[in-house]
């Protein structure tokens, strides 16, 4: 029993001493490293050499993030397009659905410049003029009767010639037209007044 207690105390002592030794050694190593760095810096300052410059640190902002997101989105869209095209190729892999493109030798060259569309053919009845009607009335006696029963000779005798009926195309002027109409109305009113004032006929008693 005493032996066991002695062994436990020795273990405690050995562990305490070993922990202290390790702490001292570690402290010694750290002090040695600091001394080495201090001596190196002092030697550099004595010789006049500057320490090497630090490499530039790359800094990114929101633009880098947006470029990364754009590249990522483009990659995802390309993958989706490839997947869709693969599915279409698998679905349309039948030989019956493949269109046949004719060769250029089989296609006949046609000169479309020389091909002119034909004009439409429309039957238009020619309208007769007054002169044609007059000539027909004078030449052909058949036109002097309507439906073989009505005689049109009396009508053709009293028809006025064309030069009497035709009027010249004259532009209307408002002032000229107003004076002309007003003068005609005044003359008519004067005639009516004269008829009212004068007796209608010769007097019975003379």
UniProtKB/Swiss-Prot annotation:
Coarsely, its chief localization is: cytoplasm
Polar residues composition bias: which ranges? 29-48
Residue numbers of N-acetylmethionine PTMs: 1
Q: In which tissues is it expressed?
A: Expressed in the retina, iris-ciliary body, lens and cornea. Higher expression is observed in the retina, predominantly in the photoreceptor outer segment.
Per the UniProt record, which residue ranges are transmembrane? none
Which residue ranges are recorded for the region named Disordered?
1-71
Q: Name one GO cellular component term.
A: cytoplasm
Its keywords, alphabetically, are: Acetylation, Cell projection, Cilium biogenesis/degradation, Cytoplasm, Cytoskeleton, Phosphoprotein
GO process terms (BP):
cilium assembly; intraciliary retrograde transport
Q: Does the keyword Phosphoprotein apply?
A: yes
Cellular compartments annotated: Cytoplasm, Cytoskeleton; Cell projection, Cilium
Q: Residue positions of the PTM Phosphoserine?
A: 77
Q: Name one Pfam family in it.
A: IFT43
Describe the task this protein carries out.
As a component of IFT complex A (IFT-A), a complex required for retrograde ciliary transport and entry into cilia of G protein-coupled receptors (GPCRs), it is involved in ciliogenesis. Involved in retrograde ciliary transport along microtubules from the ciliary tip to the base.
Known partners and oligomeric status: Component of the IFT complex A (IFT-A) complex. IFT-A complex is divided into a core subcomplex composed of IFT122:IFT140:WDR19 which is associated with TULP3 and a peripheral subcomplex composed of IFT43:WDR35:TTC21B. Interacts directy with IFT122, WDR35 and TTC21B.
The record's similarity note reads: Belongs to the IFT43 family.
The name of this protein is Intraflagellar transport protein 43 homolog
